Design a protein with these regions (language model features):
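Active-site-proximal alpha-helical segments within enzyme catalytic domains
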Residues: 125-148, 152-153, 157, 190-199
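Short, Gly/Ser/Thr-enriched beta-strand-loop segments that form substrate-interacting elements
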Residues: 119-120, 166-199
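Catalytic-loop motifs flanking and including active-site residues across diverse enzymes
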Residues: 2, 34, 69-72, 130-133, ...
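Active-site SXXK
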Residues: 1-11
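Surface-exposed charge patches
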Residues: 3, 40, 154
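Conserved active-site loop region of the serine DD-peptidase/beta-lactamase
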Residues: 139-182
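Active-site-adjacent helix/loop patches that line small-molecule binding or acyl-intermediate pockets
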Residues: 15-114, 118-124, 137-140
């Protein structure tokens, strides 16, 4: 879902660096650091926090603390860069979401219309993928066959603390693997790993 943030030029336009890319890929713990990095993406893109459509976590004060606030901030930054509507960025027919689907279908070697639509807890469109398809996507990410995938891989490994959080599995595994393993937990108990350079 972070690919359009890079391919559109939105990430380079705001010079967000590896920290900005890492937070755009995160399922984080909602710390002050995470919220600050997500806010920074919005601020650099001249966007208001009120545009975020991810929920406010129970007991928290801001949508910036939601685990994928960085993804939503990157969605908005991309939409701003491409002059796409901001208020409807989570609609399945929004150009951003169509581009996300196109890129995923491309990596899977499928026509986009064969992808099965679903919706994430955060409100964002997502896809019902088979385990083998998830494995293939992470193999592409670890193999870094495309420039944008290499940027994402590098950013996650450079800032594992932003991808998840202190004491969390993804962060600790990426630290202890010394740049050899990418790790990202997802909803419903899914855990995806990829060996850097091999997939």
């Amino acid at each position: 879902q972070a690919l359009p943030f890079l391919s559109s030029g939105a990430a380079s336009a705001i010079d967000c660096g590896d920290r900005g890319i890492a937070i755009s890929c995160a399922s984080h713990s909602g710390s002050t650091t995470h919220a600050r990095e997500a806010f920074k993406l919005l601020w650099q893109s001249d966007l208001d926090v009120g545009l975020l459509q991810c929920p406010v976590p129970p007991g928290s004060e801001s949508a910036l603390q939601y685990n994928c606030s960085g993804k939503h901030a990157a969605f908005l930054a991309t939409s701003r860069k491409m002059s796409w509507p901001l208020e409807t960025y989570l609609q399945a027919d929004h150009p951003l979401q169509q581009e996300v689907n196109r890129r995923i279908a491309e990596l899977l070697g499928l026509p986009p219309d064969e992808l099965v639509a679903a919706r994430d807890d955060c409100g964002a469109p997502t896809l019902r993928l088979q385990l083998s398809q998830m494995a293939l996507l992470y193999a592409h990410l670890g193999g870094a066959e495309q420039a944008e995938l290499e940027q994402i891989s590098r950013a996650m490994l450079a800032h594992p603390e932003l991808v998840a959080g202190e004491g969390r599995f993804d962060t600790e595994l990426m630290r202890r693997s010394h740049g050899q393993v990418l790790s990202k937990g997802r909803a419903e108990g899914i855990q995806c790993l990829s060996r850097v350079g091999e997939g």
